[in-house]
Amino acid sequence: MKQYNDLFKIIHREGYIFIASFALVSFLLASFNEKLGCMGFIATAWCIYFFRNPDRFVPIGNDLVISPADGVIQEIKEALPPAELGLGDVEMIRVSIFLNIFNVHVNRIPANGKILALHYNPGKFFNASLDKASVYNERQSVLMETEQGQKIAFVQIAGLIARRIVCDLEESNEVKAGERYGIIRFGSRVDVYLPLKTALLVSKGQTAIGGETIIADFGRKKTAELQFERK
């Protein structure tokens, strides 16, 4: 029984219906046409791959902000946080992480703390790599206060293909960095909003691993933006 439980743990529950449907159709196709059946099983395997839900080695530290998603850090800029979270007109550092269809799409809590507010905003489905996606696309915004008293926000943004955002959080939840809290289906983006004086530990173009990559450290003084060299 434990083996079956472990098997289900490595696949996010949002994928169960898709995987079962793909598998059923594949068996039906295989009974009529071997090539079509083979294509169906390949699609089923891809579906399992997309909804994979791997464990991660989460860095420990109350001052740390961990990447909430797998993907490429597409942009780091100063921007206004989502108005619905009530953070006012003061700009924050926005770290945007773009997920393609091959990335793990399970999202994780970026820091230890408490959830203060949640807001779902229906919207468009522009390509998530575009800057305007942060403003116009369907999104789920979350405001939290870290254990060190810092207010940060993180936002799940639907993309061109994505059509469903899942967020399992509720207001007043006590959360830990690296905990799974949701998923965005089929291509998307996650934005993290941090206070302006936050010391960042990542750079544009870097690949982030959700639940593992440290994107900021409140315990450090802010310095010039880090520079990285490809080798």
Curated annotation (Swiss-Prot):
Q: What is this protein called?
A: Phosphatidylserine decarboxylase proenzyme
Q: What GO cellular component entries does it have?
A: plasma membrane
Q: Where is this site: Cleavage (non-hydrolytic)?
A: 187-188
Provide this UniProt record's keywords sorted from A to Z: Cell membrane, Decarboxylase, Lipid biosynthesis, Lipid metabolism, Lyase, Membrane, Phospholipid biosynthesis, Phospholipid metabolism, Pyruvate, Zymogen
Instruction: Report the main location listed first in the record.
Output: membrane
Q: What does this protein do?
A: Catalyzes the formation of phosphatidylethanolamine (PtdEtn) from phosphatidylserine (PtdSer).
* Compartment(s) where it occurs, according to its Swiss-Prot or TrEMBL record: Cell membrane
* Alphabetized GO MF terms: phosphatidylserine decarboxylase activity
Q: Which domain of life is it from?
A: Bacteria
Name of the coding gene: psd
Report the top EC class in one word.
lyase
Instruction: Keyword check for Lipid biosynthesis, yes or no.
Output: yes
Q: Any binding details for the cofactor?
A: Binds 1 pyruvoyl group covalently per subunit.
List the membrane topology term(s). Peripheral membrane protein
Q: Name one Pfam family in it.
A: PS_Dcarbxylase
| Family statement | Belongs to the phosphatidylserine decarboxylase family. PSD-A subfamily.
The organism of origin for this protein = Rickettsia bellii (strain OSU 85-389)
- Biochemical pathway: Phospholipid metabolism; phosphatidylethanolamine biosynthesis; phosphatidylethanolamine from CDP-diacylglycerol: step 2/2
Q: What cofactor(s) does the depicted protein rely on? A: pyruvate
Subunit note: Heterodimer of a large membrane-associated beta subunit and a small pyruvoyl-containing alpha subunit.
| Record PTM text | Is synthesized initially as an inactive proenzyme. Formation of the active enzyme involves a self-maturation process in which the active site pyruvoyl group is generated from an internal serine residue via an autocatalytic post-translational modification. Two non-identical subunits are generated from the proenzyme in this reaction, and the pyruvate is formed at the N-terminus of the alpha chain, which is derived from the carboxyl end of the proenzyme.
Pyruvic acid (Ser) PTM positions: 188
Q: Which reaction does it catalyse?
A: a 1,2-diacyl-sn-glycero-3-phospho-L-serine + H(+) = a 1,2-diacyl-sn-glycero-3-phosphoethanolamine + CO2
